[in-house]
Amino acid sequence: GMLAFGSTLVTATSANALTDDGYWGSETTVELQKRLNSIAAVNSAVEGGLPLDGQIDSQLASQSSANPGLTSGWQWVSDDAASGSDTIKDLQRWLGTDVDGLIGPSTISALQSWLGQTADGVLDGPSPAIVAFQRKLIEGNYS
């Protein structure tokens, strides 16, 4: 059901601190990492074994300002130094898109399409696609 305003203060220390606020930060990433590790057990395309650290390493700095919905835990580095993230690689494998470990328009569009959202390739702050993603992560609904 719907939670009342202010409830995040009460639930922040619970097992699942994720709220559907439309911003993809560390809490969203930890839930994604848990899910990808679970999927890896049944889907050989996904490698799993991800640390539950809430970090998305070595991402293209040029994507940061274009995607204000991506917040805590995202490491933005100069584009020529960006080597990508294992978490994003597994997300890309799961979505069936090109695997380079880097968030960008093609990966975002694939995620948006899977979520039934407009595939515009950007994640606003807040983002309707991130809200839908967070709801799937909270509910454990990945069909």
Where are these regions (language model features)?
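Cell-envelope/ECM-targeting effectors and their regulatory/trafficking segments
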Residues: 1-143
